[in-house]
């Protein structure tokens, strides 16, 4: 669970409501027609701009921001270091029994190719190709969210224009002025809210998680190729530690790279 995402989501909403309460306008913030125009309209436009599977699946992707992005870099470095030691002692074929212990298919596939005697350049090409396809998928989802964020204020302005038209058309009916004015103003608020409070932050968080995963997989590629090349375990460790945070790097240096 990513506590920061929950703090950002609910804390931001609470601040908005608290400010509205202090300003005496909290009751006017909820307006169903404006909500339908802004949120519903901008979301349904995604069905026009993206395939059905993406428009429907966007909420599943949004849910990922509430799960902590942990790619187990420390464990991967430790285990690849141990495999490098074992391969130097007993040969690459001895790694076969260790492969299935990895939960990550990306790591397993790379190590399987090493054990099978696949050329290093071929292994690198295969793993980088898989990484590229993953990046393409992730970038499509992030692009979808950015599109939604861009659409929401536009629908907010559309609702504002609709409200103004209704207000101008019924100026003689004083009883409808308040409702039409509310629609005119609140849709702009909803458009800005959807964009700045929710969709754009979610897209940014997913981009951050994506960058972490790419870096993690690049580290795996480096480690697998180092094992395939028969590098000394210390050399492998020094290469992989460059991908880690300074704190984690220092801890693993003390553990793996000994005098």
UniProtKB/Swiss-Prot annotation:
The chain crosses the membrane at residues 3-23, 28-48, 148-168, 184-204. Keywords: Cell inner membrane, Cell membrane, Chemotaxis, Flagellar rotation, Hydrogen ion transport, Ion transport, Membrane, Transmembrane, Transmembrane helix, Transport. PROSITE patterns: MOTA (PS01307). It is a multi-pass membrane protein. The keyword Transport applies. GO terms for biological process: bacterial-type flagellum-dependent swarming motility; chemotaxis; proton transmembrane transport. It is found in: Cell inner membrane. Its main location: membrane. It comes from the Bacteria. The keyword Transport applies. Residues 205-259 are cytoplasmic. GO terms for cellular component: plasma membrane. Each stator complex is composed of 4 MotA and 2 MotB subunits. 2 A subunits and 1 B subunit are thought to form a single ion channel, so that each stator complex contains two channels. MotA and MotB comprise the stator element of the flagellar motor complex. Required for rotation of the flagellar motor. Probable transmembrane proton channel. Belongs to the MotA family. This is Motility protein A.
